[in-house]
Amino acid sequence: MVTDPCPELSGLLLLALPNMRDVEFQKAVIALCAFNEKGALGLNIGRIIPDVTLHSLMHQLGIQPGLVPDRPVHDGGPCEPQRGMVLHSRDWHSPDSMMVGQDWALTCTLDVLHALSRGEGPQHWLVALGYAGWGAGQLDQEMKQADWFLSKVDDQLLFSCPAENRWQQGYQQAGVDFYRLATKIGQA
């Protein structure tokens, strides 16, 4: 198991602020998985890839779905869109799993898909292709520019809420009316 070097930010959500200029990230809901002096990595859990499901992905990889239910695959972000990642509860892990915050793990190896197909995988999980990545200081700068709102997340929002509802639900859970957010943080 690998631990995250900056656990105080990993395991949180980045919610795109309503004034997000980057079209790729408008209404994005990023599960922040790693954050350190070299940069940050997260998965966009607010968007699915049309016509791609877990079963179709597993068949492409030569893995029989077995006992795992079929679910949509998330568009995790623009970096390495062919790379699969599974964000999941900590009740299952492999030696290659990275612990994310206090409650999740991120596994990027096929062993998690094999475990899911046998009914031996994590209880809660979601699959994504690609990820959102930031270089050193880049996410810090975007947060200063009021592109992102940082929030806590619960398992229901992460694993049960439909992807298309997560942005609005994330703000509601934080007690924030996103329509009233100021577009310039710290300015009167």
From Swiss-Prot:
Domain of life: Bacteria
Gene3D superfamilies in the cross-refs: VC0467-like (3.40.1740.10)
Any coiled-coil regions, as ranges: none
GO cellular component: cytosol
PANTHER family for the chain: UNCHARACTERIZED PROTEIN YQGE, UPF0301 PROTEIN YQGE
Protein family membership: Belongs to the UPF0301 (AlgH) family.
HAMAP family: UPF0301
Protein name, UniProt field: UPF0301 protein ZMO0349
Lineage, highest ranks first: Bacteria, Pseudomonadati, Pseudomonadota, Alphaproteobacteria, Sphingomonadales
